[in-house]
Amino acid sequence: MADAPSPVRMTYGGYLRLDELLNLQDGPEGYAPAPSNDELHFIIVHQAFELWFKLVLRELKEARAALLEPHVAEASIPTIVHHLERVSEIFRLLADQWKVMETLSPQDFLAFRDRLGTSSGFESWQMRELEVLLLSLIHI
């Protein structure tokens, strides 16, 4: 009988895929020169927003699914509240994250704005999905 391969030891960096994650701030393929400190700041803040939007969407979808049940069991209320409290804390954090964004002066932003082409934060599909999802929660 052949020896079973030894399991790969999970590491912090491996679990979070840090090599991939931390290379995402370098800009698109062939992007040169490398982003300046101000552009890197801009990229990281916006990527962090998108990561938080991902979690907010998941939490809100879980809460909505539970609330749309024909009968919302009393035992499920703490879980629903947990999802909504987490979303509330994330929104609080996102508001503070704008304070970090405000450390980028308009002049500093204009120094690399042309590199963004016609792109805009309004293109965030997660933000659109969040708007639609929040509107749907009004009618529950």
Predicted regions and their residues:
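Short secondary-structure subsegments characteristic of cysteine-rich extracellular domains
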Residues: 62-94
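Feature marking long nucleic-acid-engaging regions of large polymerase/nuclease enzymes
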Residues: 38-50
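Amphipathic alpha-helix face/heptad-repeat signature
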Residues: 7, 44, 52, 80-90, ...
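Conserved small/polar residues in nucleotide/adenosyl-binding loops
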Residues: 138-140
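Short, charged/polar, low-complexity loop and linker segments
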Residues: 24-41, 63-75
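Long amphipathic alpha-helical segments
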Residues: 96-112, 129-136
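Acidic, low-complexity proline/glycine-rich segments
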Residues: 1-36, 51
